[in-house]
Amino acid sequence: MTDTSSSISRKSLRADSYQPQLIEEKWQNEWKISGLYKTREPKEDQKTFYALSMFPYPSGNLHMGHVRNYVITDVIARVHRMKGFSVLHPMGWDAFGLPAENAAIERNIQPDIWTEKNISHMRSQLDRLGLSIDWDREQTTSKSEYYKWTQSIFLKLYEAGLAYQKSATVNWDPVDKTVLANEQVDADGKSWRSGALVEKKQLKQWFLKITDYAEILLKDIDTLTEWPERVKTMQSNWIGKSVGVKINFQLLTKEKENLSVFTTRPDTLFGSTYLVLSPEDKLVDKLVDPKLINDLSNFRDYVSKLSDKERTAEGKPKNGMAIGAYAINPINQEKLPIWIADYVLSGYGTGAVMGVPAHDQRDLDFAQKYSLPIKYVIKPSGIIEKKKEVKAYSEVGVMINSGPFNGQKSDEVKSLITEKGIKENWAEKKTTYKLRDWLISRQRYWGCPIPIVHCAKCGIVPIEKENLPVFLPTNIQLSGKGNSPLKDNEWTKTQCPICKGIARRESDTMDTFICSSWYYLRFIDPNNKKNIIDKNLADRWMPVDQYVGGIEHAILHLLYARFITKVLRDKDMISIDEPFKKLLTQGMVQGITFKNPKTGKYIPPNKINNIKTPLDPSTGESLELIYEKMSKSKHNGIDPSTVIDKYGADTARMFILFKAPPEKDLEWDDADVEGQYRFLQRLWRLINESKTYNKLSLDSNENNNLNNLNQDEISLRRSVHLAIKEISNDLNEGNQFNTAISELMKLSNNMNELLGKCRISVVNESLSILIRILSPFAPHLAEEAWSTLKGKGSVHEQKWPEFDPNALKQDNYQLVIQMNGKVRGSIKIASETNKQEIEKIALNSDIAKKWLIDGSYKKVIVVLGKLVNIVY
């Protein structure tokens, strides 16, 4: 007989109202005072877990993209803390860069003051989200105690021959007045920040020799088993390895110099009918016919206005000019004209290309445009040779018009021609990469100073390590025009470290991506005054276990961080090969836009009378409703503070996590935000109704009294422990927060129905588990509930619950029956029924008989405990 002395009657109870703002402010203050989220020194044999979001630029305000990033990381950190890991979850600021300098110019304020003000505001915004951040480890890249070590890394690169200065054609942003790396120019040839059409300039610049690490960066992509395939593919393509042959064409000049061309298709050498150089190549000045110098100058002016991406874009017409010079094809001694063309870039391969129009579509288009010869040397196997072809043939086939190689397979001839060239000393095997050295010079003030001085006597001289940091001067007059603001400043005047004579400091500052290429290391050892990081601490915490950030950083930041990690490893400062073990690239947060399809104009929502049938207030034309990335220009941004003020941080967190899987784009929906708020209100009522009758704490010994349960208690325990199992699986397998919250909703519904029919022991166990598995998602409500029900300590210090397999056992369950994969009904079946018996029962069911003709079927698929699928 069931003991009902402690059963609960809930009908007469009134729940307190849910007031998230009061609860959240209370617990945020409490967590700060208690230092709850400080990183604890790992105990002996305790596992560590490093959870990190890509740190933000301090623009002054968080946007919903930030919120999604940081909440995702926070949930992961909280769950691992409850699972017994020593967790490191820090935050910092990627504070150098153009926006702060431009804002300072506009407002007539120094960038450091502007930046610190923004950091202070954004830190308070992050606190309002209830993030479990260890603020004692906060880092700001624009502070000298941080950039001292950025400069130290630069010196290590310089000592290793990996940092160098050279004159180069660079991408110039005419609006921001600075140089851009190739990666910072979009497909339309525009600056990634200002949107201005990028120009070309010849300037002396600092580079990092990332190309020395191209092969290992490519090879180690295979070790990144917990990175998205999309990111790995993007990096692999960017590195762009090509294995081929360097072929020397002898120039018809007095000196008889060679022009080197790299190709992956030596089998097409007989089909080469012209050679193409980059317009910027210095050899062009030497080879050009004097009569064509003006034409050359005009062509170079035209090319200087194009970005590299514009010049090489597929489908775009290619332009060129003959320069009046010739070279000899080494395979057949034919005389080939030399051209320059916009599609050949000086930094790729050898800067020269052999034109094989019959077997390369781009070369064919160019040859047809300028009436250059087209010579076919490969034909498809078994196909009769045609006299005239209009399409390039780029596949393997049979050699023709190729002297002694005629009739042989083209893929076999590749090696034969290569060996012939090596033997005759006009070819060599070579591997090239699309990846180019990292240009780090920036002609702006607000960046990390490059620790180099220029001496008329000693040349380029690095600053001594003991004299770091080279401080960025203060109170600089910023105009935003021309060269670096530091160039003509008194600050540049210094003494040469070698000869002690007059010297000049380097006036360029570093690309901000250098600052962010190593910050994850400094969080581990933030107060180390002797080294960047203690190697033992690095071994303990690295690599970052979970890194979270946007897909837009797939090439820039992530590739640079991998490069710097490998350099520091080679310098024996750290032991790891890769910085980030697991990478999650969250999708964008999108808002609804109202767009006039005819004009392309975006209309603010507050200008529209009827949202359901929106019209342009100016023209009366119908508007398109489209979800797009949130931005001011599209009038679809949502201020996180507004949402928190109205609904609370827990609601904002729950919506962000529930609306879409983390890697997918999220469409903002006010109705769904309301839905999450109502769910938390229901949970609040459930918990508050519980506290009025629950005189035992969550830690009561009566929790152990789980024998002789009635059917309602069995059902509740099964629901609770199934939720533990499913939510744990959702979090372990792909961070599926949306399905985890769905399980929470199911559990709360079942508890709402069954709590009043159960004894205190079952109620306490159920509430304890509910609050614990809720806590990573809605930390404030969970903490208040835990405190209200007199749980010991903080809920965030409790163990993550483990499910009881015995609680999941059932005498019977509903077996879903599918016919050809579609659900057609279900039948009750005994839990111990095996696969063979299930198959028989399913085939004899009324459901199966209804769909099977003459009882015939192809196969039966049984998933024990869940479903059977009959394929017919």
Swiss-Prot record:
Keywords assigned by UniProt, alphabetized: Aminoacyl-tRNA synthetase, ATP-binding, Cytoplasm, Ligase, Nucleotide-binding, Protein biosynthesis
Gene3D superfamilies the UniProt entry points to: HUPs, Isoleucyl-tRNA Synthetase, Domain 1
Domain of life: Bacteria
Main localization, broad class: cytoplasm
GO cellular component: cytosol
Motif window: 'HIGH' region: 56-66
Pfam name, any one: tRNA-synt_1g
Molecular function (Gene Ontology), one example: ATP binding
Coiled-coil residue spans: none
Motif 'KMSKS' region positions after renumbering to this chain: 629-633
Residues given in the record as ATP binding sites: 632
EC number of the protein: 6.1.1.4
Biological process annotations from GO: leucyl-tRNA aminoacylation
Reactions performed catalytically: tRNA(Leu) + L-leucine + ATP = L-leucyl-tRNA(Leu) + AMP + diphosphate
Cell location: Cytoplasm
HAMAP family per UniProt: Leu_tRNA_synth_B (MF_00049_B)
Family membership noted in the UniProt record: Belongs to the class-I aminoacyl-tRNA synthetase family.
Name of protein: Leucine--tRNA ligase
UniProt organism field: Prochlorococcus marinus (strain MIT 9211)
